[in-house]
């Protein structure tokens, strides 16, 4: 091969977030297509893409050169920000790159969202590094351009001292400001000092045509439209991956700069090794880690079995099954070199349990390990459910075991902190993730940057289906309207063509949901770190796949909210049981055949139950009628798109209920050997483990090789499948199985393998579902209180759970400042006491201050007492308002309006009290106390708070009506107007039928359609249920005055069912105001009077009330009744009235609610 003339040494990928556009792999592919023997990656302030770059380079036969572009503030030139590119020439150099950039993040040196290093670090971190000066943007470049000749030698001497023969003056020719001036100064300096020069192109994109895309990408990052973007002026259209010939022409006058790029490339020899795993050492004393694992596993399994089988001699056959399985697993684990992994996981799980941190019973294929069960890593006995160890750890396919562990959401970080303390903070980090421009997002971002109207952009992005991970190409095939617009609309084509080029580009960084790395030494011995702006919360700069490539082991510490619910519910239950000296419950020891549980389940009463509360799942439960734990395991596996769309679910249900004959697996193609494997699923191949067992039984596969078969089937690799088919047929033939039968069964396996679910995971999560179901069945109040507490900030979920509690006969005690805690809890009477933390606008700190004072100094007597005892800076006026509006202060006075009016007096009194106390003026305080008592008396004037206002305030701070409902005052009227139809009854009414409904408007959303028309989406609430109503443009425009929050509205419309959530919705055809229906249906108003109500003062008030409402069409009847006379008098037409809410409220105030009657047609 001819000697290369140029190598690109300064190249940015899209991991630079702004400076680069192309994927590292695409850069390497482009370099390979240009016959370049090597290429560098020098992303801006990170090494995110190094592993992907390195792998692709090796795959295509290119030499990968690893580098980084960094910033630092130069003390030579007034702390100006300067750039520098570093390349690793040796393994030590690569480690130094890692060390430098990690230290920058750990120190928290951040400037305009970019991290900076310190120049002085080079005095200790310099070996194996080659420095490119940064061109005009580098420290030396700025010194040259500033004409500071006295600083040149000082600057050079630093780099020559620490980087002898490894510091190069970097030259650009990309048509940017000052480049050519700098270049001539740098060349002159090189000639006079002997410092070598090197040509680079500061590459940011693949081809010249990509410059426009690059500018759009920058504008997206800035949040600007294209013409307002400022940073893009720092780039030119020449910063593409030029060919060797193009670079040679560009620097034909400075050939040395080209030659040096090749010489540098030759010097860079870094290898990133893979194929070996690096685990932290688990301390076992003098005993080997293998023997320690065996000892702990045996100890654990004996403890498990002794608690279950009290007479071991009687159950010795069962005992031997467990020991044989345990020995097999231990042999595999030790042979594969993973005993330390199991022990590490065992330790932090046991620590969590010892410290009252809830841990899940298992997750994923790890629940199939008996060793894990023995070590208390899982709570699932794999032998009881026929789970396979080889699905988790396959001796015939070497890969790391991978336990996914669920912890209580609120305490998960405590476990990570514990691990950090055990293995060292510098050896533990979470794992980075990268957010990319998705199909919907890229359309919106590109459209905004190009200045297209919002409606145009919104229409296009909404045409992209909601499928997770969908690409624009896939969207075209699924949405014909999008494709047609692309073909026929030039603006759409322009936007989409640009969006396609940006789709999938890295946009931001995040943190893996649960991935944690534990390294045997410092993380930075293996991988660079990224930290937040304060230098905290370290995450690896490599994603989970790259972490695995370099041999670090990922542990998944996942947060599961359901465990928090279970823990809190059990805590409340056991506290009460302890007080009553009763036996407490252990949620991991509850029977799995509880009749009460399955009764609740079969009735689909699963709101709040883990995994089983969605509409679709409830529908499946109704159809399946599960009556055993195996059915619950199947539920988890069946409720997925594959089984639901394939007809497998219908077959399963029909077979369970005898509507279809059970066969193993198909009535045409079955074998008796398959019955024990498929019996629990009624002959349906539902689980991946069943695929493996069938291969073992029919064709003599080992379970390890059967797992390889399963993987090949799920990946649908034609070459692998062809090989596996031949092995399967031969094995079946050797077992005397008919060839045609074996081929047909293989075909069935191949079909179902795509739908097959991991049974180990299904069992573990079904167990969590069952635990929540059991708690709901036996302790509904505690369970619902715990569930509401876990969603204390989610008003919508709390409303659902309150309705569920009422359906189950559990009473809700409204918030009470003297009884409530921050969270929901169950009192001694078995009622749920509303949590103060669920009140909108009240922070946790405020609630804790209240509760602390209450616990230390007993109940608050009134609002003044509350304000006297707590500093107004801790409990502000706004917080007091929210407490009163929510009803939390009803224990002081039921009249919330009076309390609201008293806030200022109470606060002022408390401030004066605190002021006087601070001066210790006891005599003055005595005088002041008398004045305070007078203030209280003055405020005892009864300020009437209408029920409507009270409930509206309550809704504002709670998100729903708790102590009443504004619709209650219309109860009798609604029985006439809507024939008593309640929203909760709509599920029993035929679809596509027009009906009149009523409810209070609790939510209004106005949306703009593709044609720029408005539609309204309302939510009506009638205290029995809620209904979403869609009002289209014409109707909305005509009746918009009726569409107001907290207003009673009557809607005549068509019922339908949402395809998304299966909820009943309505399309409105007519909106009707209450006044219209009152005028149409009320035919008389009856006012009942007695002797006490006939004094002159009362009659004057009644006269005034009727007079203001006269000139209506509704007759008024006065019914007078006492022992002496009975009179029923219709007033003349002059007194006919208009019925309004205000009028009725005034009448009720005058004569009482019971003395008013409305009569209807």
Swiss-Prot record:
Keywords: Cytoplasm, DNA replication, DNA-directed DNA polymerase, Nucleotidyltransferase, Transferase
SMART domains: POLIIIAc
MF terms in GO: 3'-5' exonuclease activity; DNA-directed DNA polymerase activity; nucleic acid binding
Record's catalysed reaction(s): DNA(n) + a 2'-deoxyribonucleoside 5'-triphosphate = DNA(n+1) + diphosphate
Pfam families: DNA_pol3_alpha, DNA_pol3_finger, DNA_pol_IIIA_C, HHH_6, PHP, tRNA_anti-codon
Cellular component GO terms, alphabetical: cytoplasm
EC number(s) reported in the record: 2.7.7.7
SUPFAM superfamilies: PHP domain-like
Residues in the signal sequence: none
Highest taxon of the lineage: Bacteria
Keyword GTP-binding: no
The keyword Lyase is assigned to this record: no
Location in or out of the cell: Cytoplasm
Gene Ontology BP term (one): DNA replication
Assembly mode: DNA polymerase III contains a core (composed of alpha, epsilon and theta chains) that associates with a tau subunit. This core dimerizes to form the PolIII' complex. PolIII' associates with the gamma complex (composed of gamma, delta, delta', psi and chi chains) and with the beta chain to form the complete DNA polymerase III complex.
NCBIfam families (UniProt xref): polc (TIGR00594), PRK05673.1 (NF004226)
Family: Belongs to the DNA polymerase type-C family. DnaE subfamily.
Chain's role: DNA polymerase III is a complex, multichain enzyme responsible for most of the replicative synthesis in bacteria. This DNA polymerase also exhibits 3' to 5' exonuclease activity. The alpha chain is the DNA polymerase.
Name of protein: DNA polymerase III subunit alpha
Lineage, top ranks: Bacteria, Pseudomonadati, Pseudomonadota, Gammaproteobacteria, Enterobacterales
